[in-house]
Structure formats: structure tokens, C-alpha cells
């Protein structure tokens, strides 16, 4: 089976979040199930800089007003189609924002161009290759199925994956003529959304199947609390809604071979984590004692619950714990966490920014990772924690609920517990979870059991890829 995947970011070429990890890992995992994937992504400077010997496969003299070309290249096991459109993508800043952190004002056109190019490839314009199915990711690629509905490929099945419904791609109605869609596409069964143009909404209305990145999140987005205004649209397609948990690349994330980890280890050699623990203490200038090290590796935002972490940091220290934080985000939260580190030298360490190697070392050396998200479609850091024996302490929401088994009495007795869940996501709820963790940590035999059970969890892409392959086959066989 041939699949065209369309994504605005793909690891290891360009990454701002978990979307890139999925777009980069899923195609490789699908190979075991007979799925050949070509992934279309924009030709950002970071992408163009690393690709080697690309071949021009398709040219667009006028792609929504600008020239563009599709380049094909192999990169680290991925078969990539790069949309080389300098007018859209060759600019400073990130994939979506300028160097000052502001959204590019023409994002509507930049990602409509990506979707239009994808629909043309779906129609067979790429010489010698036409997909059996198109799989799009988030709002940046969601217009693909809209273009497919109104142009030559309405019969080709499409899947849309929602990685985070909070990001919907809504724009004013004045941009509609620039999309070059027929006038009747500006309708409630397509991209019209309360008088605006809704990219994600249009994708939801036109895709043949919708997936989210965990079963719990699939249920949550049907509610007003989590649906972000689109719960009614999603409910109208509930028969085509599927929750499939993400996996991680267990070759990259492997404590037995990870080149960043100072001392390698596995479930039977957990004592080797001590050297990594000392490295963490040194990096964050912590006291070298046996107190548990709790870590946070996250965007520092309200959605991620970082205000709660900042508010209880003093109490974590008062309970006898240590805290290290790696991340960046809202200035007020960065400041609050840095202030807590100043108040508690040797007990709290904060590093503002993102450091991929350090994120690996923190998973390998810290005792527990705190993930207090108010909503979390899937989450990856808890999967890394399970893999590395860094016990996850998570909010009971979304994919966190689906991937971490709470250490309640029954789960502990059955020796299946892998972490600690808490609800509600409040200061009180999180402090109760920290107290439970401190209690378990004091019983080293019990703590080691939690670590080992987590490390036995199957966090690979194999099961998830099998489910995606089955969904693809079902849609293709139905002739959607």
C-alpha cells in the first residue's frame, strides 16, 4: 500500500513538538506492515540545509501565486517529498513564527500551499507514483482533504490526525478567495466556521477517518471542556473517530545504548543510573544526597500545568525532595521557576531553553518526572520516562491516562503499576501525588518495582503502526 503523509514538521529535520516525532517515526514503523510512505513537508531553511542530492519530481509555476517544486530525497530511512517554495518557507524564525515569536501573517497561504500541493500529488501528478491513501496531520495539512473533495481526487481515502485540537488554523473570511476553492466550499459542511475559515474544521468535515493520539483524548474532544468548540463537528463523525496511542523510537530512546547517557543500564542494572544521577546534580548544582530528584521537561505554559509546579516548588523542597526543570515558555512562569531556584540553591535547578541531549540525561538520572498537563492529547515524555525508569507522575487526562498505570493498591499487588496518576489538576492534587511518590521512594524495593515495571512497558510504535495499517486497509478496501 502507498500512503502520502503530509506534515508541517518531521523529525529529525524540523521539530517544534510531538507532531514531528510522530511524522518521523510512524512511516518507518509502517514498513513492517507493507505500507510504503512518502512524506510531504515544507522546505524550511533547516530542512534544505541537511538534505543531500534531492531530485526535482514536480514543478508548480503558480502555487497560490508563487512558484514551487517538489523535491524527492531519502533521509535517515524516510522517503521525503520537500515542497521547495522559497517565497513561503525560506525565511528566518521557526516554521510558524518570525524571530520575535509572532505568527507569520501569511501562514494561511503557506499551509494552504502545502495542502494544495499534497492534493495534486494525490491526484497522480507525481510521475510514476500515486498513493492509495492520504494521511494528514493537524491544521497545517488539514486543507488537503478539502482540496481533494473539490478537485480531481474525491474518491481517494484520507485520514486526519489531531495532535492538539487547541491549534485549529482559523483565519478571517477575507482569505477565502486566495485559497482558490469554489465559492460553495465556504459552507458549514466544509471550511466555514462561524463566519471564519477553519482549516482544521474543514479537514474534519472532509476526511474519511479522524484519529487522535490516544483513546482518552478521543473521548475528551467530544466534550465542551476539551473540544475547543469543535466537539459538535467531531460528534457528527463519531463513527469514523479512532484513538491510537503514539509510540516512541525505542532505538533512539534506549538507556542501554543512548550515546548521551553517561552510564548505560537496563531493568536488571538500575544501580548504573547513579552515575547519571550525579551528572544531573552537577549540571543543576544540586546537593549530592539521596533525596529524590523530581524533574520537569516541558514547555512552560498554563496548559502544561507549569503554574502549579511553580507554586508548589517550595513545598517539594520542604517535603525533602529536589526539583530540576528544563524548558521555556511564558516569561512569567520562567521567572517564577528561576526565583524558586534562587530561593533554594542546591535543591532546585532550572535551565531555560530546550536541550535534547540533556532531556535524555534527565530521564536517565532523575527519579521521577512530573507531567501535570491540564490536557494532553498523548504526551511523549511519560513514555520516555517509562523507558528510562524515571517514574512518571501524571495528570489523569488524555494519553497520560492511557499509558501510565497508577500505583494503587490493586495495581501494586498485581505488580502492574508503572507510575502515579492524580486528579484534579490542582496544587492539592499534585502535592498529594508528590507525597505518594516520596512514600514509595522511601521503600526502595517498591520504587525499584515501579521502575522495572515501567521499563517493561511496550512504548514502541509496533502496536500503533499495526492499528494505523489496519485502518488504512479498511478505508482502501471500502473504496472510500
Curated annotation (Swiss-Prot):
Pathway: Glycan biosynthesis; glycogen biosynthesis. It catalyses: [(1->4)-alpha-D-glucosyl](n) + ADP-alpha-D-glucose = [(1->4)-alpha-D-glucosyl](n+1) + ADP + H(+). Pfam families: Glyco_transf_5, Glycos_transf_1. It is an enzyme of class 2 (transferase). Its EC number is 2.4.1.21. It comes from the Bacteria. GO terms for biological process: glycogen biosynthetic process. Belongs to the glycosyltransferase 1 family. Bacterial/plant glycogen synthase subfamily. HAMAP family: Glycogen_synth. Synthesizes alpha-1,4-glucan chains using ADP-glucose. This is Glycogen synthase.
Amino acid at each position: 500500500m502507498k500512503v502520502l503523509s503530509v506534515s508541517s514538521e518531521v523529525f529529525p529535520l524540523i521539530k517544534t513538538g510531538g507532531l514531528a516525532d510522530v511524522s518521523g517515526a510512524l512511516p518507518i514503523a509502517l514498513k513492517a506492515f507493507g505500507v510504503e510512505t512518502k512524506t510531504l513537508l515544507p522546505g524550511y531553511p533547516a530542512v534544505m540545509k541537511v538534505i543531500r542530492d534531492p531530485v526535482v519530481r514536480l514543478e508548480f509555476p503558480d502555487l497560490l501565486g508563487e512558484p514551487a517544486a517538489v523535491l524527492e530525497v531519502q533521509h535517515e530511512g524516510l522517503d521525503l517529498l520537500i515542497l521547495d517554495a522559497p517565497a513561503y518557507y525560506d525565511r528566518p524564525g521557526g516554521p510558524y513564527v518570525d524571530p520575535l515569536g509572532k505568527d507569520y501573517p501569511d501562514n494561511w497561504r503557506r499551509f494552504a500551499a502545502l495542502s494544495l500541493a499534497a492534493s495534486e500529488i494525490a491526484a497522480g501528478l507525481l510521475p510514476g507514483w500515486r498513493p492509495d491513501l492520504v494521511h494528514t496531520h493537524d491544521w497545517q495539512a488539514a486543507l488537503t482533504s478539502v482540496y481533494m473533495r473539490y478537485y480531481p481526487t474525491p474518491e481517494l481515502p484520507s485520514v486526519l490526525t489531531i495532535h492538539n485540537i487547541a491549534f485549529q488554523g482559523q483565519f478571517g473570511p477575507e482569505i477565502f478567495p486566495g485559497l482558490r476553492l469554489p465559492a460553495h466550499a465556504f459552507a458549514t459542511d466544509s471550511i466555514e466556521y462561524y463566519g471564519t475559515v477553519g482549516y482544521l474544521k474543514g479537514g474534519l468535515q472532509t476526511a474519511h477517518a479522524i484519529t487522535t493520539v490516544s483513546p482518552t483524548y478521543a473521548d475528551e474532544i467530544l466534550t465542551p471542556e476539551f473540544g475547543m468548540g469543535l466537539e459538535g463537528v467531531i460528534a457528527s463523525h463519531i463513527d469514523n473517530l479512532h484513538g491510537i496511542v503514539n509510540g516512541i523510537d525505542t532505538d533512539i530512546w534506549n538507556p542501554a545504548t543512548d550515546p548521551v547517557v553517561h552510564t548505560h543500564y537496563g531493568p536488571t542494572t538500575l544501580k548504573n543510573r547513579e552515575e547519571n544521577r550525579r551528572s544531573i546534580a552537577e549540571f543543576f548544582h544540586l546537593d549530592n544526597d539521596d533525596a529524590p530528584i523530581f524533574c520537569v521537561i516541558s514547555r512552560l505554559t498554563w496548559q502544561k500545568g507549569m503554574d502549579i509546579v511553580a507554586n508548589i516548588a517550595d513545598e517539594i523542597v520542604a517535603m525533602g525532595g529536589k526539583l530540576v526543570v528544563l524548558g521555556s515558555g511564558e516569561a512569567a512562569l520562567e521567572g517564577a521557576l528561576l526565583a524558586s531556584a534562587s530561593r533554594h540553591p542546591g535543591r532546585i535547578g532550572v535551565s531555560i531553553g530546550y536541550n535534547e541531549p540533556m532531556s535524555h540525561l534527565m530521564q536517565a538520572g532523575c527519579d521521577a518526572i512530573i507531567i501535570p498537563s491540564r490536557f494532553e492529547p498523548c504526551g511523549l515524555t511519560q513514555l520516555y520516562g517509562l523507558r528510562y525508569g524515571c517514574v512518571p507522575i501524571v495528570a489523569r487526562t488524555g494519553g497520560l491516562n492511557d499509558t501510565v498505570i497508577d500505583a494503587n493498591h490493586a495495581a501494586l499487588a498485581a505488580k502492574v503499576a508503572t507510575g502515579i496518576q492524580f486528579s484534579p489538576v490542582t496544587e492539592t492534587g499534585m502535592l498529594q501525588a508528590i507525597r505518594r511518590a516520596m512514600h514509595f521512594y522511601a521503600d526502595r524495593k517498591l520504587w525499584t518495582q515501579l521502575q522495572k515495571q515501567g521499563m517493561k512497558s511496550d512504548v514502541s510504535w509496533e502496536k500503533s503502526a499495526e492499528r494505523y495499517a489496519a485502518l488504512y486497509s479498511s478505508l482502501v478496501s471500502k473504496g472510500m
